[in-house]
Amino acid sequence: MHADSEALATLPADPVSQLAFRDAMSSLAAAVNVITTDGPGGRAGFTATAVCSVTDQPPTLLVCINRSASVYETFIENGLLCVNTLGNGQQDLSNLFGGKRSQQERFDGGQWESGVTGAPILNSAKLALDCKVTQSVSVGTHDILFCQVLDIRDQGESDALVYFARQYHHLPGAAPAA
């Protein structure tokens, strides 16, 4: 798809405001994830909703991380991560990893084991996607980490925790098949 130069000339010169953009993004419901890593750079984690599938050949997802985040260098140095998707009842863990607590305090909030990459996997996660980072692209204040999925642990039809309109919401899992 290519836009012609005449169409581009009619576009606004300035982007929308940061506030307007954030307000608009709050209207997009998203799964709540705790992103974790462990390796030579240390063990770290943060809460993220900016996670998205990219392709299934090879299985790849993306995670966005702010370059000013205290955990940024740790994730870049380790080059691996686990996307731990949270379920109903795990809002406190999301807040813990999204706050200003020490990494030790964050990890004390759950039971963990090491995945195939060495990244911490939350035993009670609805879904865990264990990944190696294959590419990083900088856009604005963030890096987009493209991650090849090496292992999946799925708790099945459990309830989901989502973030929408700046609030947590719980979605029921699928009803059992009759």
From Swiss-Prot:
InterPro entries: Flavin_Rdtase-like_dom (IPR002563), NADH-dep_flavin_reductase (IPR050268), RutF (IPR019917), Split_barrel_FMN-bd (IPR012349). Pfam families: Flavin_Reduct. It catalyses: FMNH2 + NAD(+) = FMN + NADH + 2 H(+). Keywords: Flavoprotein, FMN, NAD, Oxidoreductase. One of its GO terms (biological process) is nitrogen utilization. Its EC number is 1.5.1.42. One of its GO terms (molecular function) is riboflavin reductase (NADPH) activity. Catalyzes the reduction of FMN to FMNH2 which is used to reduce pyrimidine by RutA via the Rut pathway. NCBIfam families: RutF. PANTHER family: FLAVIN REDUCTASE, FMN REDUCTASE (NADH) RUTF. Belongs to the non-flavoprotein flavin reductase family. RutF subfamily. This is FMN reductase (NADH) RutF. The gene is rutF.
